[in-house]
């Protein structure tokens, strides 16, 4: 089983990036992208030892790490500042994310996500370099 991730890419489209932006330059010290595990059901035991279970509503959380000051980071900064509430106005952008893994013929598509977190500026690390930038998206829809 080959688990090589080399060649994976992420494409993001939104009002801030209407033509879409494909990220292929992964940082050296963070995961290029992560999709958090989610709880989809809850199981309990009733008084007479019978199983009681139900489905849980949940959201998907995708974190993308980028190299600071790269073209990818500069484009994501545009999206960050577009989506950050300023004054009395909020721009809640609908973001479409496509993740293409090496060896897969079709990408994983995530629709109507929202950029919920990002770094507004660089952070200097003690080893003399800038920290990688992380951008976090949340939503509920995966298109199959």
Regions flagged by a language model, labelled:
Residues 37, 88-89, 140:
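Short alpha-helical interface elements
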Residues 131-144:
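C-terminal or internal capping secondary-structure element at the end of a domain, subdomain, or sheet
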Residues 72-74, 105, 143:
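Residue-level signal for secondary-structure boundary sites
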């Amino acid at each position: 089983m080959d688990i090589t991730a080399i060649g994976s890419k992420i494409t993001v489209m939104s009002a801030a990036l209407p033509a879409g932006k494909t990220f292929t330059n992964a940082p050296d010290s963070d995961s290029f992208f992560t999709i958090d595990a989610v709880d989809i059901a809850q199981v309990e035991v009733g008084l007479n030892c019978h199983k009681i279970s139900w489905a849980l509503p949940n959201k998907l959380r995708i974190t993308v790490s980028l190299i600071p000051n790269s073209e990818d980071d500069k484009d994501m900064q545009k999206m960050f500042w577009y989506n950050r509430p300023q004054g009395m106005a909020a721009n809640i952008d609908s973001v479409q994310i496509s993740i293409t893994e090496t060896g897969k013929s079709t990408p994983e598509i995530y629709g109507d996500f929202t950029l919920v977190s990002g770094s507004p500026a660089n952070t200097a690390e003690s080893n003399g370099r800038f920290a990688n930038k992380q951008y976090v998206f949340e939503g509920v829809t995966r298109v199959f």
